[in-house]
Amino acid sequence: MSALNLTVRVHPVVLFQVVDAFERRNADSHRVIGTLLGSVDKGVVEVTNCFCVPHKEHDDQVEAELSYALDMYDLNRKVNSNESVVGWWATGNEVTNHSSVIHEYYARECNNPVHLTVDTSLQGGRMGLRAYVCIQLGVPGGKTGCMFTPIPVELTSYEPETFGLKLLQKTVGVSPAQRPKTVPPMLDLAQISEASQKLQSLLDLILKYVDDVIAHKVTPDNAVGRQLLDLIHSVPHMTHEQFTQMFNANVRDLLMVITLSQLIKTQLQLNEKLTFLPTA
């Protein structure tokens, strides 16, 4: 498959690690680079992890601690053998003159490595994210070169990562002095209540869009219409009585789990107090 047909999907933990490495950089370092880890399947490069590689850039050369990169990769393989080298990342919003030299090293580590740039300067108030592949240029028997060509990049996340992002959003706009250092886990019923309120707000937003389209206040979008149609078809067909019975059964199961967990917690606390009682 051609490198130009690749699509890059980046998980949030990768961006967090890039920002953390940028904040911990040396005072004389203007750019931070590192290795991207993940998997490639059917033209999709899924980046699930990364680590920083110490390096120094001079006017005419680049010095990178390749032995450190190999050691970090070997350690990561012991923890997660499914993650392989898929490319490399760098902070900044552009490809520099030294990028081709670094990319040449990663081309020996994997096929069609991708280059991810993360704009940690937040130009325009956003963290710019771009992905590139290197395309060889030249004529047969002549001098060859390479050109970094942009490819599609998007953010994706697993379900646990989505929950973590939602918790982080609760601290947005809160001053550092008032920002809590820890976030206690929510009770199951509180999570259901919060999810129901969010679902209700999303339904209100959809209904407003449909009403505006019918009233010719908004130009209809065919892509949105197809997604709404798929959403309607995904709703299971059942009567009101069947839905009520299924919902009540799930609520009873949830309450039973909560009750058992509270009993176990009480028993553990009682056992702990009995353990530390002085013996006669």
Swiss-Prot record:
Q: Name one Pfam family in it.
A: JAB
Protein localization: Cytoplasm
Q: Does the keyword Protease apply?
A: no
User: From which residue to which does the signal peptide run?
Assistant: none
User: InterPro entries given for it?
Assistant: eIF3f, EIF3F/CSN6-like_C, JAMM/MPN+_dom, MPN
Q: Which GO terms describe its biological process?
A: antibacterial innate immune response; defense response to Gram-negative bacterium; formation of cytoplasmic translation initiation complex; positive regulation of Notch signaling pathway; positive regulation of peptidoglycan recognition protein signaling pathway
GO CC, sorted alphabetically, is: eukaryotic 43S preinitiation complex; eukaryotic 48S preinitiation complex; eukaryotic translation initiation factor 3 complex, eIF3m
Q: Where in this chain does the record put each MPN domain?
A: 8-138
User: Per its record, what are the GO molecular function terms?
Assistant: metal-dependent deubiquitinase activity; translation initiation factor activity; translation initiation factor binding
Alphabetical keyword list: Cytoplasm, Initiation factor, Protein biosynthesis
The entry assigns this protein to a family as follows:
Belongs to the eIF-3 subunit F family.
Q: What does this protein do?
A: Component of the eukaryotic translation initiation factor 3 (eIF-3) complex, which is involved in protein synthesis of a specialized repertoire of mRNAs and, together with other initiation factors, stimulates binding of mRNA and methionyl-tRNAi to the 40S ribosome. The eIF-3 complex specifically targets and initiates translation of a subset of mRNAs involved in cell proliferation.
Subunit relationships:
Component of the eukaryotic translation initiation factor 3 (eIF-3) complex. The eIF-3 complex interacts with pix.
Record PANTHER family: EUKARYOTIC TRANSLATION INITIATION FACTOR 3 SUBUNIT F, EUKARYOTIC TRANSLATION INITIATION FACTOR 3 SUBUNIT F-RELATED
Q: What is this protein called?
A: Eukaryotic translation initiation factor 3 subunit F-1
Organism expressing this protein natively: Drosophila grimshawi
Q: What is the lineage of its organism?
A: Eukaryota, Metazoa, Ecdysozoa, Arthropoda, Hexapoda
Encoding gene (name)? eIF3f1
